[in-house]
């Protein structure tokens, strides 16, 4: 993803080739791994990363999560997803099909 590029509901994110989502059996948590580093993810963040295939837009991802997490207002969920994706994009962990 181009540095400084804004992620919008129309963006179709996917993990960059250097990033991998893994389940750490020892610690019982998801990790987003990239060269010599890793991020611990909560279940919701792991759901977002799993849906970053390049086929779904951010809007589609939010829609799927809204069905799973019906107790959370969609606007809040969208804001959180956009924020999370922006943060991992800034680390070079996302690419998109619209670039």
Roles of regions detected by a PLM:
Residues 37-99:
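Long, charge-rich, low-complexity alpha-helical segments
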């Amino acid at each position: 993803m181009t540095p400084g590029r804004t992620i919008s509901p129309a963006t179709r994110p996917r993990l960059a080739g250097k990033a991998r989502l893994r389940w750490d059996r020892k610690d019982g948590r998801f990790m987003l791994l990239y060269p010599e580093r890793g991020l611990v993810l909560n279940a919701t963040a792991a759901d977002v990363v799993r849906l970053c295939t390049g086929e779904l837009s951010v809007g589609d991802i939010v829609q799927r999560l809204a069905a799973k997490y019906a107790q959370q207002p969609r606007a809040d969920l969208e804001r959180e997803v956009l924020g999370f994706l922006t943060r991992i994009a800034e680390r070079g962990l996302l690419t998109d099909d619209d670039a």
